[in-house]
Amino acid sequence: MHPGGQAILFATDLDESSSVNAQLCELRKDGTMVDDSTQGGELEASEAGAEARHHWTELAQRILDAQDAYYARDAPTISDAEYDRLMVELKKVEDDHPELRTPDSPTQRVGAPQRITDFAPVKHLERLLSLDNVFTRDELSEWMNRVATAVGKIPNFLCELKIDGLAVDLVYRDGQLVSGATRGDGRIGEDVTANVRTIAAIPRKLTGDDVPRLLEVRGEVFFPVADFTDLNAALIEAGKNPFANPRNAAAGSLRQKDSRVTASRPLSMIVHGIGVLEGHDFPSQGHAYDKLAQWGLPVSPYFKIVEHVDEVHEFVTRWGESRDEASHQIDGVVVKVDDVSLQRKLGATSRAPRWAIAYKYPPEEVNTELLDIRVNVGRTGRVTPYGVMRPVTVAGSTVEMATLHNAFEVKRKGVLIGDTVVLRKAGDVIPEILGPVVELRNGTEREFLMPDHCPSCGAELAYEKNGDKDLRCPNAQGCPSQLHERVFGLASRGALDIEALGWEAAIALTDPENQRPGDDEVAEELPKRQTAVLSSEAGLFDLQLDDLAEIKVWRRRKVNGGPGPWQLEPYFFTKATAKKPSTPTATTKKMFDELAKAKSQPLWRVLVALSIRHVGPTAARALATHFGSVEAIREASVEELAGVDGVGEIIAESVKRWFEVDWHQEIISRWAAAGVRMADDRDEAPEQTLEGLTVVVTGSLEGFSRDEAKEAIVSRGGKAAGSVSRKTDYVVVGENAGSKETKARDLGRPILDEAGFRYLLENGPQGITTIG
C-alpha cells in the first residue's frame, strides 16, 4: 500500500484472454522453465509423466507466444476464445499433475512481461490484479454461492460490462493528471502519459472541491465500434495494414511514438477501479463510481447494483442478447461484491480478487482461414463477393461463409485469399469478416479479382450508373442465378411464406444442372442436360405434380469421409425400386399445399414476391394499404407513388420501371389467372389504432405467432420494433420474455400482457391498463 494511502480492492476489468499472464522466459527442452526473477523457479518436471510434461511445454509455449503477439506487438495471432481454451487446458494439466504448477507457470502469473520498448517503465502505486473467469451459468452460480457462504449472506452485487480494450493506470496528484501507464506485468507498465493526455474522455484536471491529494485509477481505453471501419479504410488508403478488431486499434493507437497519431484517433476510456486513494473512504463500489463521476472521470453507463442472484443472471442474459448496443466491444460481464468491507473480508489470491469474477460470453470473434472468395448473383442482378472459410464456431453456430458486399469492400478490408481473418458474428447478425491477421501471412496469399462477366449466364457485368459500387448482371430474364434467387425469395417468410420451397428446391425447379460435374470428374459419359421446368416465376402457380416427376439433381456422396462418385438423383419424387414406384415426397406434397394457400396471401406479400427492387415488407405494406390493388399501383404515376408515406422517390421510380417491363406483365397475368390474390378487400383494412406507436413483442403469446403479432401491429399503423429503447411506446410480454422485459422495466417503458395487447390493437392507447 502506498504510504499514507488507502488500498481499495477494486479489481480492474482484466482477464487472461486479454492480457499477458505469464512471464516471457526461456523454456528448456526438458520442459522446465528458467526465470531469473524468481528463486527456485525451476519446475520439477521429471516428477511428471513424460507425456504430461511434453503437453504442458507445448501449451505453455503457445500461451507465451500468444501473449507476446498480443501485448508486445499489438498483433494477436489467435482469438480470445482460443487463448481461453489453451489456459483452461493448461490448468487441467496442472490439476492432474500439481508438480507442474509453480509461480512461473502461465496460470499463476499476472500481466505482461517487461520488454525493451519505446516507452519508459513506470511502477504502479498499487499492483493491478487480474480476474478469474467462468464460462457457464452454473460456474457463475457456484461462485456466488461460495461468496455467500464466506460472508454469511447473499451480498449486493455490482454487475458491469467487461470492456474489450487496453488496460491503463492513471495517477492524479492534487487533482492534476501526472501519469498514464499501460498495465504491463501488474507492477510495472509503460509510460504513455503524453498519449493519454490526448484522449478527450480523460480529464487533465479533476473537478469538484474535495479532490483527493492522491488518486490512482484503473480503466480500459477502447476504440468505439462505430469508428473502427472508418479507421481501417483510412489505413488501407494510406497503404498501411488494417487492424483486425477495435481492441487492436485501441492498443495500436495508444502505443504510438508520436502522440499526434494518438490524438487523431477517437479513443475513449471507462474507469472501473481504484488503486490508491488518500483522504476518502467509500462504503461500496457503487458509491466509488458516483464519486469518480463527480470528479469528472468517465465511468460506465452500463452497470447495475442488484440484490438477488437471479438479477445477476438477468443482467448477463440482457447484455448477452444486446452486446452491440454498447459503444465499445464487450466479451462478458464482471460481477463484483458491492460492499467494500466484504471485499476486504474475502481478500484475494496471488493473481485475482475472490470478490469479483468475469463471466465470459461465447466468442463473437474468432480467427479462421479465408479459403476462397467467390461471387453470388442476387435476385435483382447484384453481384456480391463472399468469403468461403474453414468452418468455425462463433456465437454458438458454425460459420463457413460471409458476405464481402462488393469489390470496394474487399479492397477496403484488405483481405487476401489465404489470409487468416477475424470473423465476427453477434447473435443473429450476419457473419462479418472484419479484416486480416497480417502478421500470419506467409507470401502464398493472393488478391481477389472481381469477374467482368456473370458466372451464371455469361453476360457482361456493368454498373447501373456512375458512382455505384455494385456490379450487376443485366440479364434479369435469362440469368439462372437471378431466377432461382427470385423463386427462393418469393417463398420466404417475409413474402408468400412457402416453407417447403427452400433453396435447393428453387434450384431444382430453375437450374437442375447447377451442380453438374465436369467430364473429367466422372468415369462414364454424362447424360443429356435437363431442361428446367421453370424458365420464369410466372409459371410457378401453374406447376402440376407430374411436371416434377423427372427432375433430378447432382449429388456427390461421401465415401470414408472423402468425396465419392457423382450421382443423379430425383429431387421431388422418391427413387423407384423393384417393389415401390416413384412417388412425391412429403416435402413436395407440402410445397403444393403451401402454393395453394399462398394464392390467398394479402396484397403486400404478393408485392414482395414480385422482387421489385427496393420494395420490402415495409414499402409493400404502405403501397398495398394506399392503393389496394396491383392494377392501381401499375396505373399510378411516380409522383403518386412517391407521395405514399414510407415509399419516397427512389422506391417509386423502381416500382414504375418494374411495371414497364413486358415479361413482368406475364408474371402478373399468369399469377392472376392461377388465382393469386391481386387486390385487398378495402373493407378488410383494420382501423389505424396504432398510428405513430412503436411496439415491441417479446416472449411467446398464445394467440399470435411472432409474424402474426408483427403483422397485427403494422397493419394498424404501428411500428413493430425488434429491440427496446426509450422511444418504445409499449412492450408486450409473453412467456419466457427474457431480457427485453428487463430492459423495458429499467427504462420505465409501459408493459402489456397479451390481453392488454389485444385491447391496444382494437382500441388504441386510450384507457389501456399496463402491468408494468
Swiss-Prot record:
Binding-site residues for Zn(2+), renumbered to this chain: C454, C457, C473, C479
Catalysed reaction, written as an equation: NAD(+) + (deoxyribonucleotide)n-3'-hydroxyl + 5'-phospho-(deoxyribonucleotide)m = (deoxyribonucleotide)n+m + AMP + beta-nicotinamide D-nucleotide
Enzyme Commission number(s) of this protein: 6.5.1.2
GO CC, alphabetical: cytosol
BRCT domain location: 685-772
InterPro entries for this protein: BRCT_dom (IPR001357), BRCT_dom_sf (IPR036420), DisA/LigA_HHH (IPR041663), DNA_ligase (IPR001679), DNA_ligase_AS (IPR018239), DNA_ligase_CS (IPR033136), DNAligase_adenylation (IPR013839), DNAligase_N (IPR013840)
GO terms, biological process: DNA repair; DNA replication
Pfam families: BRCT, DNA_ligase_aden, DNA_ligase_OB, DNA_ligase_ZBD, HHH_2
Residues that coordinate or bind NAD(+): D80, A81, E82, Y83, D84, S130, L131, E160, R183, E220, K336, K360
Stored SUPFAM superfamilies: BRCT domain, DNA ligase/mRNA capping enzyme, catalytic domain, Nucleic acid-binding proteins, RuvA domain 2-like
Active site residues according to the UniProt entry: K162 (n6-amp-lysine intermediate)
Cofactor(s) annotated in UniProt: Mg(2+); Mn(2+)
Keywords of the record: DNA damage, DNA repair, DNA replication, Ligase, Magnesium, Manganese, Metal-binding, NAD, Zinc
Source species, domain of life: Bacteria
GO MF terms, alphabetically ordered: DNA ligase (NAD+) activity; metal ion binding
Family: Belongs to the NAD-dependent DNA ligase family. LigA subfamily.
Name the record gives this protein: DNA ligase
